[in-house]
Amino acid sequence: MLISGRSGWAILGTGGKAAVNRGDAGKLGGQSVIARAHVKVDGDVVSRFATCCRALGLAVYDRQRPADLAAARSGFTALARIAHDQCDVWIGLAAAGDVSTPVLAAISCTADTAGMLQRQVELAPAALGFHYDTGLYLQFRAIGPDDFHLAYAASLASTGGPGPYAEADQIVTGIIDRRPGWRDARWVAAVIHYRAGRWSDVVKLLTPIVNDPDIDEAYTHAAKIALGTALARLGMFAPALSYLEEPAGPVAVAAVDGALAKALVLRAHTDEESASEVLQDLYAAHPDNEQIEQALSDTSFGIVTTTAARIDARTDPWDPETEPGVEDFIDPAAHERKAVLLHEAERQLAEFIGLDEVKNQVSRLKSSVAMELVRKQRGLMVAQRAHHLVFAGPPGTGKTTIARVVAKVYCGLGLLKKENIREVHRADLIGQHIGETEAKTNAVIDSALDGVLFLDEAYALVATGAKNDFGLVAIDTLLARMENDRDRLVVIIAGYRADLDKFLDTNEGLRSRFTRNIDFPSYASHELVEIAHKMAEQRDSVFEQAALDELEVLFANLATSSTPDSNGISRRSLDIAGNGRFVRNIVERSEEEREFRLDHSNNVGTGELSDEELMTVTSEDVRRSVEPLLRGLGLMVPHD
C-alpha cells in the first residue's frame, strides 16, 4: 500500500472476486470446458447465439435491433451451460456485463474457438467484444485471444495475493514475449507489479510508456500518475514530483491519487506549507475521502518507502510481507536478534513475582503495538497512538525493570531500533542558568534516541511550584522533542500516582501524549518474602525458615503502618522503605551479617565449615541487618 493508513489510492475493479485455477476455468454448473478448434456446431446453438447477439444490439445476418442487455445476459448465461466449449458464448456473456473472474477464465481457456459462432451468424469483424478493467485507472477492449488472456490476468490480479499475482504475471509475461511492443500488455504487467508493491518493476515497465508520444491523453495521464507513485514509494521524491507536479488530467480518479501523492511527496520534502495547500484544495473537492481528511489533520501521515534491493530480497517475490525491513536488510541477523529480545522480555516478565495486573497490561501493550505494525504494513487505517507510558506506583515495585522489558518489546517488534533505556532524574535535566536547562535536556534526549527515556519521579521537575522554575523549560523542551522525534523516542515517566497527576496537569500537552497508564501496586508481605527467597537462591544463599518468618512479620508490620516522607506526606512505611529495593538491601546486609558471624566462629580456619553453613542466613542475621536499615530510612525499629 502507498501510505501509512488505509489505502485510498483508487484502483478500479478491486472487488472481492475469487481466484480461479486455470484447470477450473470455463466451468459453469459443474461442466468442464474442452477447447477445440474445429468442431461442428449444433444448429440450435447457432440460432440461440444469434438471438443473444441481437439482444446485444449487434447486426446479425445484416439485421439489427435495439439492445436489451438484461435479455442478452440471461440468454448467454443459459447458452453457456450447453455450449461451454465455445469462446464466443463466453465473450457474449462478458459483453452483456458479466466480466467476473470465472467468465474471463473461461474466455481465456477456450480462446482457440473464438470466432467460430461469430462467423456462423455473419457478425462484422471485431463487432463482438467486451471492455474489462485493468485494475488501475484504465479499461481496455478485448476482441482477440491475446486480449482475452490479458483480461483474465488483470482480473486474476485484482483478487490479490501472492498466488494470483504470480499466475497473472506468468500469463502476461508469455504475451509480452510474443509481442514485446504491445503497450496494453505492458500496462497490465505494471498493474500486477503495482498491486504487489514491486515498485522498481513498475518504473521499468512504465517509463517507456509515459514517454511514448503516440499514446492518447488518458493513457499518458494514468501512466504518469502510476509512475510518479512508484518513484515516491522508492523514496525518489524529486523524480516522483516531476510526474506528479501537474496531477490533473482526463482520468478523474488518477487526478485525485496524483494530487494526494504530490502532497505527501511535498511533506516528505519538509514543505508542509505547500503540502497543506494541496490537501486543502483536495479536501474541498472531496470531503468524503478519508485519506485526504487524515492526511490534512495528521502531519505524520506520509509515504512508506522501500528500495529495489529490499524488494528483490523478498522470500516470496509476490508477497510484500516477506520483504525485509530496513534494519533486517542492512543486518540480516537483526531479525533473529529481535526474536531473542521478545523471548527475553517474555521470560523476564514471567519471572516477576506478583504484579499480575502489570504483566497483563504489558502483554496487552505488546499485542497492541504488534497489531498496529501489522495493520500499517497491510495499508490499513492505523489510529495515531502515542507509545509513551505512565508507570504509577511507589518505589521498589519494579517500574524500572518493567521499563527495560518494555524497551525490549518495542525493539523486538521493530518500533524502536535499540533496547537502550536512559534513566534520568531532575538533576540530569535542570541547569543553573538561562539556556543551560534546554541544552542539558536536549543532550539527554539525544542520548536516548531510538530507545526509551525513563524519567523517574518526573514530578520533581515542577516540585517548587515557581513560575520561573527551570523545570518548566525542561518540560517544554521534552514535549517539543517528543513531537519532532516521535518515531525515535519513547518516554516513560514514573512515580506516585497523585504526584504524577499533578505533573501532567502542569502542561496541557502532557496528558495528550501520556495516554497509557500502568499502575504498580505495593507488594504484599508474602510476595516480598518470596522475592527474598528467590533473590537469595540466585546468590547461593538460603534463608532458614525462622528467618523467613522474621521477614514476613517485618513486612506485614511495615505494610500496615505509615510514616511521613521527606515532604511530610504520610505514606505506607513499606513504600518509604522501597518494597523490592528494601528486600534487596536486606538480602545483601543479611549475607554480610552471616559472613561476619562465620568469620568469628570457632570453625573458621579449620576447614570444617560446611556448604550449608556457608549458605544459610539465620533469623539473627536478618534481625541484625534490618535494624540499621530501618534507622537509615527513618522508620521505627521493631522490638521483641
Swiss-Prot record:
<dbReference type="InterPro" id="IPR027417">
    <property type="entry name" value="P-loop_NTPase"/>
</dbReference>
<dbReference type="InterPro" id="IPR000641">
    <property type="entry name" value="CbxX/CfxQ"/>
</dbReference>
<dbReference type="Pfam" id="PF21545">
    <property type="entry name" value="T7SS_EccA1_N"/>
</dbReference>
<dbReference type="GO" id="GO:0016887">
    <property type="term" value="F:ATP hydrolysis activity"/>
</dbReference>
<dbReference type="Pfam" id="PF17866">
    <property type="entry name" value="AAA_lid_6"/>
</dbReference>
<dbReference type="InterPro" id="IPR041627">
    <property type="entry name" value="AAA_lid_6"/>
</dbReference>
<keyword id="KW-0963">Cytoplasm</keyword>
<comment type="function">
    <text>Part of an ESX-3 / type VII specialized secretion system (T7SS), which exports several proteins. EccA3 exhibits ATPase activity and may provide energy for the export of ESX-3 substrates.</text>
</comment>
<dbReference type="InterPro" id="IPR050773">
    <property type="entry name" value="CbxX/CfxQ_RuBisCO_ESX"/>
</dbReference>
<dbReference type="InterPro" id="IPR023835">
    <property type="entry name" value="T7SS_EccA"/>
</dbReference>
<keyword id="KW-0547">Nucleotide-binding</keyword>
<dbReference type="GO" id="GO:0005524">
    <property type="term" value="F:ATP binding"/>
</dbReference>
<comment type="subunit">
    <text>Part of the ESX-3 / type VII secretion system (T7SS), which is composed of cytosolic and membrane components.</text>
</comment>
<protein>
    <recommendedName>
        <fullName>ESX-3 secretion system protein EccA3</fullName>
    </recommendedName>
</protein>
<dbReference type="InterPro" id="IPR011990">
    <property type="entry name" value="TPR-like_helical_dom_sf"/>
</dbReference>
<dbReference type="InterPro" id="IPR003959">
    <property type="entry name" value="ATPase_AAA_core"/>
</dbReference>
<dbReference type="InterPro" id="IPR003593">
    <property type="entry name" value="AAA+_ATPase"/>
</dbReference>
<dbReference type="Pfam" id="PF00004">
    <property type="entry name" value="AAA"/>
</dbReference>
<keyword id="KW-0067">ATP-binding</keyword>
<comment type="similarity">
    <text>Belongs to the CbxX/CfxQ family.</text>
</comment>
<dbReference type="GO" id="GO:0005737">
    <property type="term" value="C:cytoplasm"/>
</dbReference>
<feature type="binding site">
    <location>
        <begin position="393"/>
        <end position="400"/>
    </location>
    <ligand>
        <name>ATP</name>
    </ligand>
</feature>
<dbReference type="InterPro" id="IPR049078">
    <property type="entry name" value="T7SS_EccA1-like_N"/>
</dbReference>
